[in-house]
Amino acid sequence: MSRIEQVAPYIATKKTNYRFVVLALIFIVYAINYADRTNIGAVLPFIIDEFHINNFEAGAIASMFFLGYALSQIPAGFFIAKKGIRGMVALSIFGFSAFTWLMGTATSVLGLKFIRLGLGLTEGPCPVGLASTINNWFPPKEKATATGVYIAATMFAPILVPPLAVWIAMTWGWRWVFFSFAIPGLVIAVLWYLLVRTRPSESPFVSKGELETITAGQATPDARRENIVISPGFSRLDRLIRVRDLSPISTVKGLFTSKNILGDCVAYFMMVSVLYGLLTWIPLYLVKEKGFTFMSMGLVASMPCIGGFIGAIFGGYVSDKWLGRRRKPTMMFTAISTVLMMVIMLNIPQSTVAVCVGLFFVGLCLNIGWPAFTAYGMAVADSKTYPIAASIINSGGNLGGFVSPMLAGYL
C-alpha cells in the first residue's frame, strides 16, 4: 500500500482545503514556465554579441517560441478535454524543461530558433491544463481570485529572472542561464503527477466537506452564463457590459462560433502583444538606448513585473469580491489604462526613478484585468468544454507574442 493510500482515510474524515495546495503548485509551475520562456530577454545582448545578429533576427529567435506555443494550444485543449489534466501537464513541464536545457547547447542562430519553437510546443499544453485545473478545483466565487494568483506567477518569475539571469550570464556565461533554469521543472513535473488529479473527486487528499464547497454554485445548463451576483447596485454596470441570460456552451462548434470566446481571444491578442513586446525588449532597450549597466538593467526591467504581480492578485480579488464575479469591467479597465500608460511612457523624463515608476504602473494596469481574460471563459463554457475554450483564447492570444517581439525589433 502506498503512503498516499495510507493517509487518505484520515484526510477524508476532516475538512480539508487541499485546493489551495493545488493552487500553490499551479503558481510554482507557471512561475517556472514563465521563467523558462522569458529568460531569453535578459541574455539577448549576449546572444547578439556572440552570433553577430541584428535586432530583427534576435526578435525572431524570441518569437519562435510563440509560434510553437500557439500551435500546440488547441490540440492540447482537445486532449485534456478527453483524457484529463494530470499526465498532460506533467509531460508538458518535463518537455519544456528539457528544451530549456537544450537552449544552452545551441551553436547557431537556426538551432536557437528551432529549440525555441520546441520550447513553445511543449509549454503550450501547460496553461490550458492549469486554467482547467482552476476551473475544476475552485467554486465560482473563488475562480477569479485563484486565477489572479495563477496569473501573478507570470509576473513573479520575471521579477527574479532579469537580475538572476544577468548574474549567471556574467559569472558563468549565458548558456548556464538555460542549464540552471531547466532543473526546477524536472522536479516539479514529478510532484505535479503525484499530488494533482484532474478533478478533486479523484484526489485522496480532498474531504467530502471540501468537495461540497468546490461544487457549490457551479454552473448548470440553466444557469446565468456569467454566473454573477445579482444586485440592484450593479444594474447600470450590467447594462454597460451587456449581461445576458445564456446557458454555458457545451459543444465544440458552439465555442468556435461564440462571439464571447472569439472576442476574448482578440482582446487577449492585443494585451499579449504589449506584454511580450515589453518582456522581450525592455532589457536590451535599457542597455542600448538608456545607457543602463547590465546589473542595473536587471532591476529596472523587473519593475513592470512587480506592478503586474500586485495587479493580477488585486484584479482577481476585485472581480470576485467587489464586482460580484463580473469579468468585463476589469478587462475594460486594463485595456484603457494600459493605452494611457504607454502614451505616458513615450514622454517619460530621462530619470531612473521616473522610468521605474512608469514601468511599475504599466505592469499594474496591464495585469489588473489579466485574470478576467482567463476566468471569463470559465462561465462561457461548461466544465467539459472549458479546456478547448481556454486553448482557443490562449492560442489566438499568444499569436500576439509571436508578432510583437519581431515587430518591435524591426521598429
Where are these regions (language model features)?
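C-terminal ends and interior cores of transmembrane alpha-helices
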Residues: 94-107, 336-350
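Extracytoplasmic gate region of multi-pass secondary transporters
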Residues: 40-44, 247-313, 370, 374, ...
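Helix-breaking motifs and short loop linkers at transmembrane-helix boundaries and internal kinks
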Residues: 52, 84, 105-111, 122, ...
